Amino acid sequence: MTFKRIDLSQYIVTSLCFTCNNSCTICMLSGVKQKMSGIDLDYFRRVIEEIRDSGRFENLILSGAEVTTFDDLDHYVQAAASLGCFKKIQIQTNGRRLRDKEYLRHLIDQGINEFFISIHGLGAVHDAITRVQGSFRETMAGLKNLEAFDVNVISNTVLTKTNCHEAAQPIRILSQEKISEIHIWNYFPMEREDTKDFVVSMKEFGRLLPELSGFARSAGKALVLKSFPECLSVGEPVFFDSLFPVTVLPDRFWREFSECGFGRCFYREKGECQNRECWGLSSAYLHKYGDEKDLLRPITPSQPSPLEGEGKGGG
């Protein structure tokens, strides 16, 4: 079976705003978004014209903190669509405003043809993560509205200790929706220690994988795992994918990101693992659970990445 996946190497992300109608406990921007400002339309036009002229990317992602809280979003979408160079224009969104079907229709009419929607659990679990009561209901209403349109929909769930105990159930439900692929992201702690107690151990994650894989296989959909150690791969329909699209964000964010110690690996640091794309473990993970050298394994030319048979680049 061929599993449909997008190729993120062909996407570039532009962040338009840093406002949000959720207050997620897991937000990577929570410590910096109040200090960052969005981009005006003239500057955005220059950015997307440079992207077009580079010829490097064929798809555009519009993001924010929550891009649908940006009142002028439709004008930015229209500007991007008018260039005629982007096959896909995606928004990354919590999906709550998409419950307004006319608002959704207007965005699609302006040029949005792909939606990346975050759903972090069922009911109260999702609402506890977003810290907005009723947000799960609104997001699912938005997801339901998308069924009426010829657009690509991808779901995203960030795995934390808050939702891992019931992670299988939302994945089961999402696998039955009009969604082309299901993403699960490993939680990125924007700190060197897990002070919030969100980081899930790879052993616990490994226990979840067979059930998650079963739901995806039954639905004929790809289950894409982002920023997990690639040596844990179990084969299709599960795809361990370390690739993230090029992302345009203020330097302040990248400075803080670089201080958090991502990409740690016992075997890579010893020179035994040759995989340079894998996200490995974070400093916060190492502090909490250790280096997992008995669980992980080096990927070398003689011991190739299990991803080679998975079509890692997508398509």
Label every model-predicted segment.
Residues 109-114, 177-181:
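Glycine-enriched alpha-helix->loop->beta-strand junction motifs that scaffold or abut catalytic
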Residues 1-92, 98-113:
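Conserved alpha-helical substructure of the radical SAM core
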Residues 2, 237-238, 242-304, 315:
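Flexible mid-to-C-terminal extensions adjoining Fe-S/redox cofactors in radical SAM and related proteins
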Residues 308-313:
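Glycine-biased, low-complexity coil/linker segments
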Residues 21, 67-69, 95-98, 115-132, ...:
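Conserved radical SAM core fold
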Residues 10-14, 60-62, 89-91, 115-117, ...:
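Hydrophobic faces of well-ordered beta-strands that scaffold small-molecule active sites
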Residues 1-13, 22-26, 208-231, 288, ...:
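Flexible, acidic/Gly-rich N-terminal and inter-domain linker regions that tether
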